[in-house]
UniProtKB/Swiss-Prot annotation:
Pathway: One-carbon metabolism; tetrahydrofolate interconversion; Amino-acid biosynthesis; glycine biosynthesis; glycine from L-serine: step 1/1. Homodimer. It is an enzyme of class 2 (transferase). The gene is glyA. Keywords: Amino-acid biosynthesis, Cytoplasm, One-carbon metabolism, Pyridoxal phosphate, Transferase. Belongs to the SHMT family. Catalyzes the reversible interconversion of serine and glycine with tetrahydrofolate (THF) serving as the one-carbon carrier. This reaction serves as the major source of one-carbon groups required for the biosynthesis of purines, thymidylate, methionine, and other important biomolecules. Also exhibits THF-independent aldolase activity toward beta-hydroxyamino acids, producing glycine and aldehydes, via a retro-aldol mechanism. (6S)-5,6,7,8-tetrahydrofolate binds at L121, G125, H126, L127, S355, P356, F357. This is Serine hydroxymethyltransferase.
Amino acid sequence: MLKREMNIADYDADLWRAMEQEVVRQEEHIELIASENYTSPRVMQAQGSQLTNKYAEGYPGKRYYGGCEYVDIVEQLAIDRAKALFGADYANVQPHSGSQANVAVYSALLKPGDTVLGMNLAHGGHLTHGSPVNFSGKLYNIVPYGIDESGQIDYEDLARQAEIHKPKMIIGGFSAYSGIVDWAKMREIADSIDAWFFVDMAHVAGLVAAGVYPNPVPHAHIVTTTTHKTLAGPRGGLILAKGGDEDLYKKLNSSVFPGNQGGPLMHVIAGKAVALKEAMEPEFKIYQQQVAKNAKAMVAVFLERGYKVVSGGTDNHLFLLDLVDKDITGKDADAALGRANITVNKNSVPNDPKSPFVTSGVRIGSPAITRRGFKEAESRELAGWMCDVLDNINDEATIERVKQKVLAICARLPVYA
């Protein structure tokens, strides 16, 4: 018999120590990695529930195992909420991650060797949009598109590449692009060559849900997203579509299960259902509006202090610092800011002279700081501290002074009160 009072601390001290140290790290560091966020205790409660025990291969009402009457309710709640939140008429909540969702879309609609247009990773794209080190770049013939001199997507070049290469699919979406994507224009280009238009909105799903960023669902044939990042739910994936193409929906479902996955993670799907309900609350819209305001506030400070921002600004939750002119590598900037308890990630910039392991840029995002209560004033102050560190990247005294300020503001604005 299993006793509910069993706990990790009494059984596995080494593991518990590492877990507790991570709790302290999250509370005492300012998180600026654009893909990270803090999920709610309600989501964590769902993920730690007895739903983790249940195998449920198949879909609600069509399972291969018995005893699924209650997990069917859980999954259907998640499906219905996803459709309502994003204005879709199809949703699959089973993908274990955003990458798994993308795998399912590719395998449902493409054959190995098919041509695909995806955003260049160095211009803000994602590994799963055709990077040669990823399955997408190995299985398919990838033609990259990118940004123009102004830092915006070059739609003329995209249309030209589409006409020349006649891809089977065009991918919209990004991991380090700070502009607004013209989904309608991309669909127009896809339709002109009879290609699938697939959008990966993982980074902006929360902004989309709150009406702060344009919704791709009415324009794309298929949309995928993660359920964490700006959506602030559990780590997982989601597939959406609109238009009533039942044949497409069947292909997508079959591609997820049994095509690429076995049993769904019911405890995570419950967490998704909670997060999707939270995203329907008025407070969530206020939060997402603040995310965008905070990112703009930080950009303004970096520009005032003489730092270059790719695209010259941001219209979402993230932006990219280009450090080429400062003769600072992204790797060194990441490390110095880390010593001041500010967490970022090094990131390639367009035409980066450095390798992806070194880079000349830093990606910065505002979802996590906003979640813990930062407004524009704190965001501007934080950006100033970051400039102090980068201006004096080898001065440990400056880094220590900034660290003490970080610790003070983290104590004032805890993640979990």
